[in-house]
Amino acid sequence: LVTYNSVELLINNLGEYSNDQASSLDENKLVEMLEINLFSAINLTQSVLPYLRKSDASSIINIGSVMGLTANKEATAYSISKHAFKAWNDSLREELRKEKIKVSSIYPGAVNTSSWDNTGADREAMIQTEDIAKVVGNLIDLSKTCLVEEVRISPMNF
């Protein structure tokens, strides 16, 4: 930032997962999920926003989770945090639209990452990280007059 004094692109890609149920939700676990899955993105975005405003073609790409669009009875705290992330993302997009700062969100389903280590899950059937990267690249390559608000990505057979 010192060298260039502006930023054209911010990608928020974060996540911590937990298994829990609504009927026995631990408040501390929920706070932890919100801190990681929501507040870290808010804090980073607020820190970088003055630099994004200096560019005439800025974008923020927030990578959330399909669990921000649905619910999972086995991952309540995670689902709550990702729903909150989506609400913040939608509000941010509408706020920054007038400043011509694009805010797009990607909501992937199961992605083949190390979080699936030792689970026995069929990782070849999951979304591959390269596919997410291609979607991000496509969003970046769009003209400054085109805004893709949301992209939902699902595995074919997981």
How should each PLM-predicted stretch be described?
Residues 21-22, 26-31:
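Substrate-binding pocket helix/loop in short-chain dehydrogenase/reductase
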Residues 23, 72-76:
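Active-site loop immediately N-terminal to the catalytic Tyr-X3-Lys motif
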Residues 45, 81:
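Active-site helix of classical SDR
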Residues 70, 91-101:
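Active-site-adjacent segment of SDR/Rossmann-fold oxidoreductases
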